[in-house]
């Protein structure tokens, strides 16, 4: 693994297993991590496990205002964001032919639109620091 001492990572979907493991790996490599998700309890448990260099930022990625605020909150908490892990995603357990337009749009809002908005929200700061990892 790389030495990420002094780097700051924002991980979405960190309240789930994959996001939690990503946060653990980046933290173990020396990064400060901002862990984000919709469920506060698993985020707080992960933060307690990691100890220092961790910030809990709840965010519902289906809310455009919350998505816009998340990169700013992460940068304020950590000083900057050098690494963005767009791990969060949703599915609607339904046959495609039965999926409503609203269900389809909610999946796209979280899995695609929020991803683009988060990238856009952190990119300027990453470019200034000349260290970009998306």
Placement of each model-derived feature along the sequence:
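Substrate-binding pocket helix/loop in short-chain dehydrogenase/reductase
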Residues: 95-96, 103-108
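Conserved glycine-rich cofactor-binding loop
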Residues: 8, 15-17
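Conserved glycine-rich Rossmann-like NAD(P)H-binding loop of the short-chain dehydrogenase/reductase
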Residues: 29-45
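A glycine-rich helix->loop->beta "capping" turn
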Residues: 52, 73-84, 92, 103
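A short, exposed helix-loop element centered on a Lys and neighboring polar residues
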Residues: 119-120
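Active-site loop of short-chain dehydrogenase/reductase
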Residues: 7, 79-81, 126-134
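The beta1-alpha1 cofactor-binding region of Rossmann-like NAD(H)/NADP(H)-dependent oxidoreductases
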Residues: 58-70, 101
């Amino acid at each position: 693994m790389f030495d990420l001492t002094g780097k700051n990572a924002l991980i979405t979907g960190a309240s789930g297993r994959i996001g939690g493991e990503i946060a653990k790996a980046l933290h173990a490599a020396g990064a400060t991590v901002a862990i984000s998700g919709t469920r506060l309890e698993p985020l707080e448990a992960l933060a307690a496990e990691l100890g220092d260099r961790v910030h809990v930022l709840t965010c519902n990625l289906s809310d455009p205002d919350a998505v816009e605020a998340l990169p700013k909150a992460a940068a304020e908490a950590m000083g900057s964001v050098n690494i963005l892990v767009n791990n969060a995603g949703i599915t609607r357990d339904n046959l495609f032919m039965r999926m409503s337009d609203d269900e389809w749009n909610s999946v796209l809002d979280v899995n695609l639109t929020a991803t683009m908005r988060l990238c856009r929200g952190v990119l300027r700061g990453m470019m200034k620091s000349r260290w970009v990892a998306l």
